[in-house]
Amino acid sequence: MNYKHGFVDLVGSTPLVRLERIEKEFHLKCRLFAKYERNNPTGSIKDRIAKEILLNALERKEINQDTVIVEPTSGNTGIGLCAVAASLGLKAVIFMPSSMSVERRKMMTAFGAEIVLTDAKAGMPGAIAAAKEFASKTPNSYIPGQFDNLDNSLAHYKTTGPEIYRDLDGNVDVFLAGFGTGGTITGISRYLKEQKKDILTIGIEPEESPVISKGVKGPHKIQGIGAGFKPAVLDLTYVDKVVTVPSEKAYEFARLLARKEGLFCGISSGANVYEAVEIAKTMEDKNIVTVLPDNGERYLSVEGLF
């Protein structure tokens, strides 16, 4: 018999897709590959870190079956945590600004999570403060803390990186990904460089908010990257180069992925593929790899995207 033991067994082992039509569109002399992360159970790469963080916390006895998982989040990590918590029989309480989309709230409540809406004007800092206050007053509560928890990057070191290396038989020349929590770029790059030191690793941030490369914070439209600060999880030791991508190009390439490759992905996927194309224009006969972190369905209400 061949079957999976619930949610956690479904996470990872996503396909690596060659973007051949985009290669032809731009007359590239390199091969572009992308890790198709929408194939994770809730449709994003964040399922990997949600699984790693909660399973490790259970193993270390930092949490138990009566623990309340508390996380301030507005995006994919929250959805992943709610799903993993449900599969493990844990209660989740998610704090998010009231400005966040109704779709995301409904996804989390579908997994049995409790949603606490905070003042939209206070943004994520307000949600973080409210979550910490709640946790301080709630016995046996646990904040996963995706920006600070090293199990975040460990998930990618243990799974995503090895999957990429295996699927290309070790023939990886360039890897690039956006800076969100820093877990994806840190974990994957660390693994790849341990196998092959001369792999070029590139981190991507919004042109309008180049915090890592220039120390400048600003508003941008690339959801999922550009947190506005340097996360503790991000280890630049494993990043050779930092580049910026304009929000408009991220939008354009998210549309291009759908219309040329039939891959319906989110905004950060567009940013990653735009930069992969730009790098490919400067090289020949190289394997360039990036990630497509989530699906486009979560961004249907974003004006001007699709």
Map each language-model feature to its residues.
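PLP-dependent amino-acid enzyme catalytic core
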Residues: 1-306
